[in-house]
UniProtKB/Swiss-Prot annotation:
This is UPF0246 protein ABBFA_001173. Signal peptide: none annotated. Belongs to the UPF0246 family. InterPro entries: YaaA. The lineage of its organism: Bacteria, Pseudomonadati, Pseudomonadota, Gammaproteobacteria, Moraxellales. It comes from the Bacteria. One of its GO terms (cellular component) is cytosol. HAMAP family: UPF0246 (MF_00652). GO terms for biological process: response to hydroperoxide. It comes from Acinetobacter baumannii (strain AB307-0294).
Length: 259
């Protein structure tokens, strides 16, 4: 199976890296085109476009200016260690074993507004460019039009490389919209995580994001390859709810913790 996760806004370029192994992103010629567009934006325009503060906008204007497609450890780090957010708290990549990282390199992918599709060990320079950003570019009015079928085609290549016909969608809707489902040459399964609150089960963003990371870790550590195997996921109190699941959507619930 091949699992997809979203990137994170928060980045970590400080923590000591557990490995010096790396690969280069495969869609950099497209990234460079986006950088050319972004470099023409002022900090104020970035602030408005991305709905961020002037401080963050200025930081990212500097990042766009300094970006270059020659990545090494002086200016970049591996994607799986660079992203720091709720999903990556669940994934906890720094404590994965070498064999787990090897498996992840083949079976885990991170969607990205700037880099398209990243493997765990792909080096990346720091950036902020969310997939939902309405950035006018040479191919359209937003990043979905820019990436078009490029990400989808790369996913299909990666599925073929591991001889898999199963794609596990652990990404947010914003990022998964960059994938053309109709052209994916595989069965697609989406795990959904519901937490109980005031007696009702619902998606609670913080918990759901972390759970997606936990599921990615579960897939990696157990080297899963069948959709049926996902149902055994029981980390941090989640359990499979067969009654509310379907072939395409696997529902996992967690009961409210009593004080």
């Amino acid at each position: 199976m091949l699992a997809l996760i979203s990137p994170a806004k928060t980045l970590d370029y400080e923590t000591a890296l557990p490995t010096d192994e790396f690969t280069q992103p495969r869609l950099l010629e497209h990234s460079a085109q986006l950088i050319d567009v972004c470099r023409k934006l002022s900090a104020s325009e970035i602030a408005s476009l991305m709905s961020v503060s002037e401080k963050i906008a200025t930081l990212n204007a500097d990042r766009f200016r300094d970006w270059k497609p020659e990545f090494d450890f002086s200016n970049a780090r591996q994607a799986i260690y660079a992203f720091k957010g709720d999903v990556y708290t669940g994934l906890d990549a720094y404590h994965l074993k070498d064999k787990d990282i090897d498996f992840a390199q083949q079976h885990l992918r991170m969607l990205s507004g700037l880099y398209g599709l990243l493997r765990p060990l792909d080096l990346m320079m720091p950036y902020r460019l969310e997939m939902g950003t309405k950035l006018k570019n040479t191919r359209g009015h937003n990043l979905y039009e820019f990436w078009d079928d490029i990400i989808t085609n790369q996913i299909n290549e990666d599925l073929a490389a591991i001889k898999s016909e199963l794609l596990v969608n652990l990404a947010s809707d914003e990022y998964y919209k960059s994938v053309n489902e109709k052209k994916i040459k595989a069965e697609i399964v989406k795990p959904v995580f519901l937490d109980q609150k005031n007696g009702k089960y619902k998606v609670i963003s913080f918990y759901a994001k972390k759970a997606r990371g936990l599921m990615a870790r579960f897939i990696i550590e157990n080297q899963l390859n069948k959709a049926e195997d996902l149902k055994a996921f029981n980390t941090e109190g989640y359990y499979f709810d067969a009654d509310n699941s379907s072939a395409k959507e696997l529902v996992f619930k967690r009961d409210e913790q009593q004080a």
